Amino acid sequence: MTSDFVILELLVKLNFALGWCVMSDLSIPHIKFSDGGSTIHFSHANGYPPLCYKALLSPFEVDHTVIASVHRPLWDHSGEPDSLRSWEQLGDDVQGLLPEMVNPVISIGHSMGSAAVLMAAVKKPDYFHKIILIEPVLVPRFATLILQALPSLARRAWPLARQTINRVDSWIDRDAVFGHFRPKQVFRRISDEVLWDYVNSGTVIDELGNYKLAYSKEWELQCYLKVYNCWELFKSLKVPSLIVRGAESNTLSRKAWTRLKKISPQSECIEIPNSGHLVPFEQPEILASKILDWIDS
């Protein structure tokens, strides 16, 4: 890790602890990882702040300016979680950030972050040179309709919603955070080093001196409840695109993957072995290499 990155990480941790985000000279909250070369923009997933992705993004810093969106759940004065009415707001935020950069950019998104990139790319294709969508969230239309019509029922009956709101989110120190997450099945393919990135970058110290998740579970739940139906967007996508699936994903199902390749034949679609929905953390070096090869092709 470079000394500049160490300084950046310390500043970002301080900013998150104080309720701020890194702004520099751009108006939409973001983090600037590096400065030099063409711009790569990154859009993070629900529940995973940008600095958790250090292992994935580090290879891009060598020859590129790397800037990551900071989505609304991490903003200062972002309002209550119910102020997020749709993921379309996240797409609008990406769309609002990019004109202040040197365009067009290469944009990478993971999960919810890929939906934000996709929405912005469909609305403003001139802002983008290429896009990479990692494990885009694709749900059946009926599911989004149910979530919109019956949010209270979804909170009570949807296993993911119950799991999110009931999870432990406060610990006495970061060793306790690591010890809590290390045995989790969802993190089984993630190395200790990358898991520590999540622990160090995904927690802040509260007013009682405890370590808590920087990305609150109330905001995380709201993002799940406001999932957007992205299927139709792929039919309108004109920007060159690479779509990535973790070969063992339980989020982007095999059935959805097959359908996606049919409705978006203009996109290049690849799978990363020995990985699932968290492929940016499970296989960061392989994924970064695949993306760089595609960018240069």
Residue ranges of each PLM-predicted region?
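Conserved HGGG/HGGXW glycine-rich cap/lid loop of the alpha/beta-hydrolase fold
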Residues: K32-G79
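Active-site loop/oxyanion-hole signature of alpha/beta-hydrolase fold enzymes
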Residues: H71-I108, L147-A149, S289
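Conserved hydrolase catalytic core segment
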Residues: P104-L145
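Flexible "cap/lid" loop of the alpha/beta hydrolase fold
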Residues: I131-S170
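Conserved serine/cysteine hydrolase catalytic core
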Residues: G202-R259
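Catalytic histidine-centered segment of alpha/beta-hydrolase-like enzymes
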Residues: S275-P284
